[in-house]
Amino acid sequence: MSILEKITSSPSECAEHLTNKDSCLSKKIQKELTSFLQKKETLGCDSESCVITHPAVKAYAQQKGLDLSKELETRFKAPGPRNNTGLLTNFNIDETLQRWAIKYTKFFNCPFSMMDFERVHYKFNQVDMVKVYKGEELQYVEGKVVKRPCNTFGCVLNTDFSTGTGKHWVAIFVDMRGDCWSIEYFNSAGNSPPGPVIRWMERVKQQLLKIHHTVKTLAVTNIRHQRSQTECGPYSLFYIRARLDNVSYAHFISARITDEDMYKFRTHLFRIA
């Protein structure tokens, strides 16, 4: 079985919380843009996202008072390097996690962080995990700030400092489901967590031990999965997505997941245009 078959995502460009994937668009927008959608080839398009981002369609929508930006944000996957090996930006990552937080209603999507989070203002270092669990921590979902109880937490960190341009993406996942809770660090290159992450994990562990009897920290780093120079972002997102879909962390320490798997996973992450 392919590793991608273990998760619930698909190559459709529609946001995953939509049940009808025949069209990503709302019925109102479909109706208003029927003529454009029927002749999308003449626009040089092969997807709905291409159609609604086309200058002619955007101009028409503006005249009609149609909010296409909301359609893109809530009914399509995030933009990003779907069909190439371009490096993922923090926008690609955060916008993907925001969309997953719509599908997974008990998932807390934390904005990205650089590795100097202990001295620079990042949400990651300010989160109280007990408040996350109880629904007292603010998070951004569907274009608005909300509070809701969450039993999973995910964040993608960069190993560079905020003064740099970025080096390597890694993942943090906190699982507050079941009897034994876990605070997990995943690095596709197989490197151990650096000091700031170790301290963060231990601090969060002490927070959670106040409300739950068993909490462990895990470094999921015993296998060097990544061999390329480009796939750390997809690997980090894949770890979070797999864990949300109840794939055990043990899967990542028992067999290598290939770069080729991540090339395919990109088509699950991003919309076509």
Swiss-Prot record:
It holds the Pfam family Peptidase_C48. It is an enzyme of class 3 (hydrolase). Its EC number is 3.4.22.-. It comes from the Viruses. This is SUMO-1 cysteine protease S273R. Belongs to the peptidase C63 family. It comes from African swine fever virus (isolate Warthog/Namibia/Wart80/1980) (ASFV). GO terms for cellular component: host cell cytoplasm; virion component. Its main location: host cell. Cysteine protease that plays several role during infection including processing of the structural polyprotein or inhibition of the host immune response. Catalyzes the maturation of the pp220 and pp62 polyprotein precursors into core-shell proteins. Plays a role in the disruption of host pyroptosis via specific cleavage of gasdermin D/GSDMD. In addition, strongly decreases the host cGAS-STING signaling by targeting IKBKE via its enzymatic activity. Also impairs host FOXJ1-mediated antiviral effect via degradation of FOXJ1. One of its GO terms (molecular function) is cysteine-type endopeptidase activity. The active site is at H168, N187, C232 (nucleophile). Signal peptide: none annotated. It is found in: Host cytoplasm; Virion. GO terms for biological process: proteolysis; symbiont-mediated suppression of host innate immune response; viral protein processing. Coiled coil: none annotated. Induction: Expressed in the late phase of the viral replicative cycle. Substrate binds at Q226. Keywords: Host cytoplasm, Host-virus interaction, Hydrolase, Inhibition of host innate immune response by virus, Late protein, Protease, Thiol protease, Viral immunoevasion, Virion.
